[in-house]
Amino acid sequence: MANEYKKILLLKGLELMDEYHFIIIKSLLAYDLGLTTKMQEEYNRIKISDLMEKKFQGVACVDKLIELAKDMPPLKNLVNNLRKERSKVARKMKAQGVVLMKKINQEEVGLVAPAPTARNTLTSEVGERIPVAQKRKTLSKGKTEAKRIKVPQEQSEPPHPSGASTSAATDHPPLPHTSSSTPSNTSFAQNQQTQAQCQVDTRRNVPQKDPVTVMVLKATAPFKYESPEHGKSTMFHATVASKTQYFHVKVFDISLKEKFIRKKVITISDYSECKGVMEIKEASSVSDFDQNFEVPNRIIEIANKTPKISQLYKQASGTMVYGLFMVQKKSIHKKNTIYEIKDNTGSMDVVGNGKWHNIKCEKGDKLRLFCFQLRTVNRKLKLVCGSHSFIKVIKAKKNKEGSMNVN
């Protein structure tokens, strides 16, 4: 799909520009692409697209051209067309991903064996190589036995939007999405690990068609990240709230940054939900909402509330965490840094690597964490950073919040 984005860049972007605006684009790209004055004069559209593809991999090359061209009024139609073409490719990639996942599920689970749920866990476990006649008998027996299995309430409830994604800590309504029951009998967990993983993969990103109107509470500065599907790209985090609940948001379309201004009311559609967090991508739509819209103070207070560390220890591994925590200790290692955070209920380690390795902070400072994940490391629950994680540091002495410059 990377080639699809390059086709958009070259055929729908650079090739449709007049010479004057192409010269401007080359000048603006000179620093990023390392262009000398001579190169700017000699390089044509094909050469520039080759360099942009290497520097800004995947969709990032189209994003970069949009970013540069959107401030040029004569290129307004070209920019709109680039966004449409980018969305088409994004939808195509999403559709191919669904087809591929279905194929994987069929290969792993088998076309005959049903997906493991609370009702058919027993049959899917033993039905892999049983003759048809015997399988029917086993299925009947399995259904009878499965009725005795009770699904715990916490497993049947949909995940909450993460405030640290913890209902106990924040007491908020869930992010609307489709959920399915999970097997409750732990004795079958090991045997069905492959099937369960397939189910998790297909559920990890759930499209949401219904639009939602929200007020922007806060947003981070854009930052660079790297992922297998997009390579190096840019995103930012935001927190928004409707009249009944709040959402942590990952925004992967940087052109939407101007929409995420504090107290601005917007309508979001065609977004998706992953692990309780709203995701806005190229195919999503964000528009202004001009009517009167008020968010109850209680919702805003809950959205801004940091979960207690004692509550984090009660959450499952994999829970997404957001919040403001005080640094108690900083331990620098060769490959990562351990930031010990503390409140009046306990302490926990935050593992920072990559861009979050050895950031400038000390005891007494506060770390505002975005999109950190609870993980069990050496039999101890810790907060671990991922590719989408972000940290803001609030210095204790100056009491002034600022994001780390890590690029």
From Swiss-Prot:
Region spans: Disordered: 122-211
Superkingdom field: Eukaryota
Main location: nucleus
UniProt subcellular location: Nucleus; Cytoplasm
Motif position, Nuclear localization signal: 131-137
Primary role: May act as a transcriptional activator/repressor in the myeloid lineage. Plays a role in the granulocyte/monocyte cell-specific response to interferon. Stimulates the DNA binding of the transcriptional repressor protein YY1.
Protein name (database record): Myeloid cell nuclear differentiation antigen
Native source organism of the sequence: Macaca fascicularis
Upper lineage: Eukaryota, Metazoa, Chordata, Craniata, Vertebrata
Gene of this entry: MNDA
